[in-house]
Amino acid sequence: MMNDKKITSFIALPDLLSMLNASSGYLSILLSIDGSLNAACILMLLAVLFDSLDGWVARKTGRIDIHGFGKNMDSLSDVISFGVAPAILIYSAAVDFRYINILVGPLIVLCGILRLSRFNVLTGGGKNFTGLPIPVAAVTISSFYLTGFYSELSAAFIMIAVSVLMISSIEYPRVDGMGASTALILIIATIISVAAVEILQAASVVAGPVAIILFIATLTYIAVPILPKRDVI
């Protein structure tokens, strides 16, 4: 049992990245409320990057999370960035069907909490996740909004499906190696291209197409485990 109860005795380098994840999610929420939705999407994608890095840093530094502090930090941060932030975004983006997104928003948050709670109590790593990983919710809605083809009803339908898949028992593969690198490159490219449009007022000839590629890649990841398997003869 740990006798030292000082908060600093629990915190390791990966936890600082989890804090950056949570901070990005919080800022995304503020920007959505303020109506700066492109910037809110950028902050959500930035949170995904920090979330990816905290696990990588934990493995590289050989962290032994005996008391589960890091796991809980990660999950609590994820609720903010990948549960609450997407819910606030779709509500803030709604004009004609706001009442629908009032109902969809809590569904995203609650299913995200259930998904993370189950993840925390299940032991062992394995090659697959049980249920859709919650960061996918943030990547899905932010990339969809940034495509320039955002639709309130389509967003509501997609996020309902994502929420249900998070609490499903469908096995989703852990993305690592080349797949992880490609995903991170797409996310970074989307962040940079949209930021250039927002900050430099540059022409959005790149931002839209990059976001479309990221959105399609995310939908592919979501759909593949659901599609019926064909027997190879």
Curated annotation (Swiss-Prot):
Compartments where found: Membrane
InterPro entries on file: CDP-diaglyc--ser_O-PTrfase (IPR004533), CDP-OH_P_trans (IPR000462), CDP-OH_PTrfase_TM_dom (IPR043130)
Signal peptide: none
Keyword hit for 4Fe-4S: no
Disulfide bond recorded as keyword: no
EC number: 2.7.8.38
Transmembrane spans: 7-27, 29-49, 75-95, 102-122, 126-146, 147-167, 180-200, 206-226
Catalytic reaction equation(s): CDP-2,3-bis-O-(geranylgeranyl)-sn-glycerol + L-serine = archaetidylserine + CMP + H(+); CDP-2,3-bis-O-(phytanyl)-sn-glycerol + L-serine = 2,3-bis-O-phytanyl-sn-glycero-3-phospho-L-serine + CMP + H(+)
GO function terms (MF aspect): archaetidylserine synthase activity
Activity profile over pH: Optimum pH is between 8 and 8.5.
Record pathway: Membrane lipid metabolism; glycerophospholipid metabolism
Keywords, ordered alphabetically: Lipid biosynthesis, Lipid metabolism, Membrane, Phospholipid biosynthesis, Phospholipid metabolism, Transferase, Transmembrane, Transmembrane helix
GO cellular component, one term: membrane
Means of activity regulation: Activated by Mn(2+) ions.
Protein name: Archaetidylserine synthase
